[in-house]
Amino acid sequence: MQPTTTGDLLELMESYIASAALGAAMELGLFWLLAEQPRDAAGVGEALGVPEKRCEHWLELLSSMGLLEELAKAYAPSSSARTAILEAYSQDTWALLAQEAREQFPAFHDLALRIREPDSTWAPQEPTLPDYVARMGERPERARRFTRMLYEIHQPLADELANSLDMTGVERLMDLGGGSGVVSLALLHRHPRLAATVVDVANVCKAGHEIAVENSMEERLAFHAADFLRDELPRGFDMVLECDVGIYGEALFRRLGALLNPDGRLVIVDRFARAEGVAQLSLLYRAFLASLGIGDFTIHTVVEIQTMLAQADFQVLSESTLPSGRIVIGART
C-alpha cells in the first residue's frame, strides 16, 4: 500500500489491529471452524472461549476485510477466504505462520523509543528470537511443524527450480540448508539418475526424512545433520544448491568449493537486491525486521554475492530470475 492521503496514513497506522485479528483467527482455527458449520458470535465465542461481545467485534472486523460473510445471522468463510486460505495451505501451516508473526512483534514494542539502539530494539523484558539453529535444536516438535510448513509453502519454488535448473552432468546434489528437501524432491522426480543429500539441523533432518519416506524417495534422498558453518561435511558432489538460506560469505563459499567434484557447480537462489537501495517490498519488510535484532543488517546485492564468489575462486557462470522474483546465480570452481 502506498498512502496518498491523510486518511490512508491514519488507516495504515492502525493496520496492526487487522493483522492481529487475522493472526488470531489463523492460530485459533476460526476459518476452519466456520467452514464446518456457520455460527453466530455466541456460537464462535462458546467454541473458542472468547467473550461474546469481543467475538462479535472480531467477526465484524474480519467480515469488513472480506474474509467472512454473514448468512442468516451466522458467519461463514467468504469465497475469497476459501480460495486464499482454506484451499491454499493446511490449517497447521497457517497457524504456524501466524504464530511466527506474533512472536516477532515484540521487536516493534516502543520502537520510537528504542530505534536508536545500536544493537537489538527488542524490549528488555522480551527475549529476542534465537537463531535458526538454536530454535530448531531446542524444540523438536516446533522443528517438525516448521519443516512441514516450508515443505508446503515452497512447492511452487521447488517446481520453478526443477523446471529451470540445468542439471547436466549432475548425479550427486548437496541441498545445503534444504530443510524438508522440497527442492531436492522436485529435482529427484524430474531427474531419475539424481541422488541428493540435505544438510540441516538434526531435528529438521528427522522431519525431512519422514517426508522423503512419504514420497517413497528415502533411497535417493539422504539427510545429513550438521551445522554447515562449523561441522565437517560430506564431499564428492557435482552440485551444491543453497536456496533461501540467507548465509553467505567468502569463507563459506571456499568451504563449499572443497565439497565439489572437479568442475562442480554452486547454485545460489535467494531474493537478492538488484543493486544497493533497489529491493522488492517483501525483502524490505524482512530486512527492516532483521535490522531490529542486528543493527547493521544489510541486504546483499547480486554484485556482492558475485564478488564473494570470485574471492573464493569461483567463476560466475550465470544469473537469472525466477517467476517468483528470486535470483539464481550459478558458479563453478
PLM regions: where:
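Alpha-helical subdomain
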Residues: 1-64, 69-70, 167, 172, ...
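Conserved Class I S-adenosyl-L-methionine-dependent methyltransferase catalytic core
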Residues: 12-16, 22-25, 32-33, 53-171
